[in-house]
């Protein structure tokens, strides 16, 4: 899982963007190494998942200026192409599909599960 911050430039993502890019590059190299053995490697972009936006988590990031999680969720929804924030079940359902035989031809890629919050 990465946040998709490797896809573009955004303030306050100077550490996350390069780390995501490195992880995504590693996944592609790993896919080329283990693919001949029939192993697939697929990553997921997740960002702004509603169930992870707790007041406690945001306090760790924002300190004393903790915004109301509902306001943050609405801001994410407004910024997303699908006009809704991604949900944990979106990520879980996508991961289950990718792990299944129905996705047998998918490897060495990142699947975007951000409701269009991140695009490349």
Q: Where are the model-predicted features located?
A:
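Catalytic loop of short-chain dehydrogenase/reductase
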Residues: 1-36, 45-50, 78
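A glycine/serine/threonine-rich, flexible loop-to-helix segment
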Residues: 49-79
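C-terminal substrate-recognition "lid" of short-chain dehydrogenase/reductases
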Residues: 84-113, 118-119
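Charged catalytic carboxylate motif
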Residues: 22, 53, 90
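Conserved loop-to-helix N-cap of the C-terminal "lid" that shapes the substrate pocket in Rossmann-like
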Residues: 43, 66-73, 84-92
